[in-house]
A protein has these predicted regions:
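Selected transmembrane alpha-helices and immediately adjacent juxtamembrane segments
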Residues: 2, 111, 115-134
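Membrane helix-loop-helix hairpins that form the core translocation module of multi-pass transporters
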Residues: 40-115, 171-179
Length: 212
C-alpha cells in the first residue's frame, strides 16, 4: 500500500513540475534566446535555477515557509528588483538586433547562462511564493515518506526542469537552420515582450503590495 501511495505521490510531483516548466515565463524566454548560439543553454540555465532553488527547498523543509508567507514586504522588494531587472533584460533583447547573430551574440548578449538562470530565479517573487505555498504541500507530503524520499523528490523535480531546458535548446538548434530573417525577428520580439510583460507585472504588483 505504501508503495502505491509513493508512486502516486511521485506522479503528482511530475505533473506539478511539468505544469511549471510548460508555463511560459522569463526563464523559458531567456532559454529560447540563448539556445540559438548555445545548444547547452537550457542545461546551464537549469543549473543556475537549481543553485537558487535547492537552498530555498531546504529552507521550506526546515519550516521557513511561514516566514515567507508572513513577510509580504520582503517578497514585494524582491518583486520590485526582479521587475526592474526583467524590464532591463527585455528592453536589451528588444533593441539588440544581433541576438541571433551567433558570433556577435556569443560575446555580447549571451554571457553566462548560469548567471541568468540564477538572477531570473532569485528575483522572481512568484517562484518564492510557489515554494512557500504549493511547494510547502509537496515538501510536507514528501516528509511523510522520509528524508531520502524528500531529497529524491527534489531531484525528480529538477530533472524535469533540466530535461525541458535541454529539449528546448536542442529543438532551437535543430530548427534554427530553417529560420527566415523575419522569423528570427518575430521570435526575438515575442521573447522580449514576454519578459517585459512579466517585468511590468512583478513591478506593479509588488509596488501595489507595499502601498496597500
Amino acid at each position: 500500500m505504501a508503495e502505491i501511495e509513493l508512486a502516486a505521490f511521485i506522479g503528482f510531483v511530475l505533473i506539478i513540475s511539468l505544469s511549471g516548466v510548460l508555463f511560459p515565463g522569463p526563464l523559458t524566454a531567456a532559454t529560447v534566446v540563448r539556445s540559438y548560439s548555445d545548444k547547452w543553454a537550457g542545461a546551464k540555465v537549469s543549473v543556475g535555477h537549481a543553485i537558487v532553488e535547492f537552498p530555498l527547498f531546504l529552507l521550506v523543509a526546515a519550516g521557513s515557509a511561514t516566514f515567507f508567507q508572513q513577510n509580504e514586504p520582503l517578497i514585494a522588494v524582491i518583486g520590485i528588483v526582479g521587475g526592474a531587472y526583467l524590464l532591463f533584460f527585455g528592453v536589451k533583447l528588444w533593441r539588440d538586433k544581433d541576438t541571433f547573430d551567433e558570433e556577435k551574440s556569443k560575446s555580447k548578449f549571451t554571457g553566462s547562462a548560469v548567471v541568468i538562470g540564477i538572477t531570473l530565479t532569485l528575483f522572481n517573487p512568484a517562484f518564492i511564493l510557489w515554494w512557500a505555498t504549493i511547494g510547502l504541500v509537496v515538501v510536507t507530503d514528501a516528509l511523510t515518506f522520509g528524508t531520502t524520499i524528500l531529497l529524491a523528490i527534489w531531484v525528480i523535480h529538477w530533472l524535469v526542469d533540466l530535461g525541458w531546458g535541454i529539449g528546448l535548446s536542442f529543438g532551437i538548434q535543430k530548427a534554427k537552420q530553417y529560420y527566415a530573417s523575419q522569423m528570427k525577428k518575430v521570435i526575438r520580439f515575442v521573447c522580449a515582450a514576454l519578459i517585459l510583460i512579466f517585468g511590468v507585472y512583478f513591478l506593479t504588483s509588488s509596488i501595489w503590495t507595499i502601498a496597500a
